[in-house]
Amino acid sequence: MKIVNITTQVESIELKTPFKTALRQTSHVEFVRVEVECDNGFVGIGEASATKVITGEDIYIILTSIASVEELFLNLTCEEALGALHTKCAIGSSAKASLDIAFVHLLSQEAKKPLYEYFGATDKSALKSDITISLNEADVMLNDAKKAFSNGMDILKIKVGSDILHAIDIVRKIAKELPECDILVDANQAWSFENTVLFIENMLNTPIKLIEQPVEAPNLDGLKKITELSHIPILADEAVFTLKDAKKVIEEKCADMINIKLMKCGGVSKAIEILEFARNREFKCMLGSMLEGPYSINMALHLAFAYRDVIEFVDLDSPLLYKEMPKELDFVFDGCEIKPL
């Protein structure tokens, strides 16, 4: 089975409401879809989301990156293509992820297995994802949280910004109003060390499951100090792109957990390397995503079922934020629960 053609197209999906974080705001998910065709008629599909503020890649960069390397993969097997992608291609992590996802999709077809079985999953019982509550005015965020809970969502990821008093206020309000919910707080690098400590001190009587990337990604010393003093688990996100990053954070105890995203690490094969490293060290992870298209989310969901012993939290809620639920998924969402079709 050899690769004979690679095509790309730009896609956009409208969201129910604007998605707001400390880093960006958007009303649509924009991504590049990649189709890789083999000589036996099999087609592998991958996607790359445009999240320039995090990965440095916009739609144009993703398209030109893929175009610059696609001829390298023609007439190669998918195994050969994966090897070439990760050893010979100096392109961004999201562009790389789109090709990696497509190649792995083809390998699962060649093996005649659904993706979760190809990854080694044996337990198909439901998983649970969080849902994101976008950064907004406190009353809007509280209303959004209540609405999410009424729709069966009981794991809430609260996006907060640099205004630490607003963050303290809204997290307390949501936790008080919705005591049945698990609360995850995501600062997206917006806080200083001092404000992070202030937030933690103000959460002594508020049950929080984790704080995600409170300080800027390069500040691993600060992140480590916060992890040491915090009674709330600390999750590293933007600080961890590659296996090398993950090893450093885990081995130097800079955080209690790491967030693995296909768009950060360069695809599903690289995510597996990080998950295997974490599994061998009994270190828990979140499997997360950017705002992404349905095929890349679908791939991550399959992976989540295979590594449920390592993955403490699933943050793959993009389809729940779309204006319309996509038909491309191999899973069904029932509130927070995710089940294979």
Curated annotation (Swiss-Prot):
SS bond list: none
GO BP terms: peptide metabolic process
Top-level enzyme category: isomerase
Organism of this sequence: Sulfurimonas denitrificans (strain ATCC 33889 / DSM 1251) (Thiomicrospira denitrificans (strain ATCC 33889 / DSM 1251))
This protein's UniProt keywords: Isomerase, Magnesium, Metal-binding
Name of the featured protein: L-amino acid-D/L-Glu epimerase
Short name of one Pfam family: MR_MLE_N
Job of this protein: Catalyzes the epimerization of dipeptides with L-Glu in the second position. Has epimerase activity with L-Gly-L-Glu, L-Ala-L-Glu, L-Ser-L-Glu, L-Pro-L-Glu, L-Val-L-Glu, L-Met-L-Glu, L-Thr-L-Glu and L-Phe-L-Glu (in vitro).
Binding site for substrate: 132, 157-159, 261, 315-317
